[in-house]
């Protein structure tokens, strides 16, 4: 069979499933990522290779660029759909998760990597930094709904805002791991540069450029003379341009682009909070995100089925994976929410649903290309196993748990979605 034609056929099926599967799965204890990985496994058994078995150990640059792009698209979407204006008090639950849960998770996972896997300081820190952030791509089912739909309870808000910011805020820890690995030891020579550049400058630049990008793009979209406003086009394609501009502008001045994209999206919302155009931007971005996610997870499933990474899984790797998902994240999340005033059930759900995903692959690929890490194959195997378990366990649990949350709020999860500007046809479905 002609491999090119076969590839087009498979891509056509995947694109069609991108639109149809969320509708088909809306009442089932399954998620779109589970189906994508299963499709990748099935395709790996085919006599031709319609999609690559993208072993990241063999091509870290490809893994880095693909995951980087889908993450920034997801970050823009996450920022656009948060209705709650940023603030110290209104975002208290977010600051707790970022300031307590994430550093605690990094420390505990690094400790597991050092004590159980026998990793050195740099590799253990990299493992913790890569796995601590929750994922904005695979966590769509536990996030808030589209802009101005009223689907923003505290649980969904916490998981959305946390995923939007912690991908960028974990970058300093990745850079610390790179610095230690580059000097072949945990000495203090790197510390001053790390604090001044990787922590202070890059975080400051990320926030500042994100705010500036959001203000400029918001002005062009909503505030220029009416005939020239981007919002008048009604074209959601602009979301992709906003994403690329805010990310690249920040990276050019050596800031953290992940932080900038999310901040830019929040700022854009604040420029004209109730415009229906935010819905158009969000919907287009979500479609692109879903398509890219499906393609990457199909490749992920194909790589798993190929077996070279899973062959490295032993009881140590399995133990670290289980402890990370069952103990580390729930414990860190719960500790961070002590005294927050939330009910125990809410704290439990927020603590458990810290989904790991494509952001972890990005960080590992990026770091692997910057410095030589010992036993990097074991790190990759551990991360892949944790992503697989997280996708399956959280994917099975998310539908009944989110339905319970909506029932507690007195909301029908399957109702049509309404925006302030009018009705959006169709049903709310699991993404």
Language model: regions and residue ranges:
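Transmembrane helical cores of multi-pass secondary ion antiporters/exchangers
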Residues: 1-431
